[in-house]
Amino acid sequence: MTERIVLAYSGGLDTSVAIGWIGEATGAEVIAVAVDVGQGGESLETIRQRALGCGAVEAYVADARDEFANEYAMPTLKANALYQGHYPLVSAISRPVIVKHLVKAAREFGATTVAHGCTGKGNDQVRFEVGIQTLGPDLKCIAPVRDLALTRDKAIAFAEEKGLPIETTKKNPYSIDQNVWGRAVETGYLEDIWNAPTKDIYDYTATPEFPPAPDEVTISFQAGVPVAIDGVKVSPLQAIQELNRRAGAQGVGRIDVVEDRLVGIKSREIYEAPGAMALITAHKHLEDITIEREQARFKATVGQRWAELVYDGQWFSPLKRSLDAFIEDTQKYVSGDIRMVLHGGQAIVNGRRSDTSLYDFDLATYDTGDTFDQSMARGFIELWGMSSKVASGRDLRVEGK
């Protein structure tokens, strides 16, 4: 029986060429797997037909937009996950859902190997292969760009030689990855980290220097998940899409950062994540009034470690599952409404309310009706500073000898 290989297929030049390239290099039949995580562009049927036209014996396509929003974006939101304080894990959280469908397709079509289009110096090769070996430990992995010397120039030449139904061009100098949670742009002109991004780089966001009138929006949450916008019920996918539109129109969610890649190098990245950043901002402000102080402090540490694990391709790891359990427990009271103004590249919260809030007006007010017993403060301060006071006395005693 002829060996079968499933290929993570985007519909672009590199993976279209990879179908024939893999076939010629290995003698295997190739099954193309395309997963829609909200990247937009062509329909799944168009992509399926192109895969078949490029030589795939089968084409597996999946509309995973709701799955991605519910099972991958929402845990990211609950964690307030920003890798190194900036990056909302746009590409990192899409890889596990793609891996899940790659392994599913491999089982369905009897494949023994999974192929992906990643290079040998990026994070995604790790995310794909660690995920595949976790969900399908018997499956082998290959990367045509890394393992079979498939360069961009060779891809163009191969496509033209074989007459493949795909545009061959070098016009776009950037590497772009996008989904409903955001958009990532790298390489080309951006590799000189002194170069400012040019306007043509952006697609999800309008220029914030000339914004339209301020847009006030109220986001309602239930147990950490957005359930309504301005009183209209929404699914997680709809919430992200609506805020991509509204926050994007105001230039919210542009990020220019040099980050530490898993493989040991620093890389300049431009991100656009209007919906994600607006939601994370709103969610964090709701947590500020619904989560107890010590729990909130520890959750911030957990969220940072969670982001590192996911960035590093450990979505399916035992530690990540344990952190998920903690984060989920913190969300049971994170319900209520956040009002924010979207304008000029910023999402500024100006109102919050919750039936499960820990904010007590009578304790917080400085006006008549204050129920806070200020007479307790003196004793509290004495005890709170006791250890520092004792240590200082010791230092003075020892140093004075």
From Swiss-Prot:
Keyword Transmembrane helix: no
Signal peptide feature range: none
Reaction catalyzed: L-citrulline + L-aspartate + ATP = 2-(N(omega)-L-arginino)succinate + AMP + diphosphate + H(+)
PROSITE patterns in the record: ARGININOSUCCIN_SYN_1 (PS00564), ARGININOSUCCIN_SYN_2 (PS00565)
Pathway: Amino-acid biosynthesis; L-arginine biosynthesis; L-arginine from L-ornithine and carbamoyl phosphate: step 2/3
Binding site for L-aspartate: 119, 123-124
Name recorded for this polypeptide: Argininosuccinate synthase
Family: Belongs to the argininosuccinate synthase family. Type 1 subfamily.
Entry-linked Pfam families: Arginosuc_syn_C (PF20979), Arginosuc_synth (PF00764)
Binding-site positions, L-citrulline: 87, 123, 127, 175, 259, 271
The species this protein was found in: Pseudarthrobacter chlorophenolicus (strain ATCC 700700 / DSM 12829 / CIP 107037 / JCM 12360 / KCTC 9906 / NCIMB 13794 / A6)
Lineage: Bacteria, Bacillati, Actinomycetota, Actinomycetes, Micrococcales
Enzyme Commission (EC) number: 6.3.4.5
Gene expressing this chain: argG
Nucleotide-binding in keyword set: yes
Subunit structure: Homotetramer.
Binding site for ATP: 8-16, 117
Subcellular location: Cytoplasm
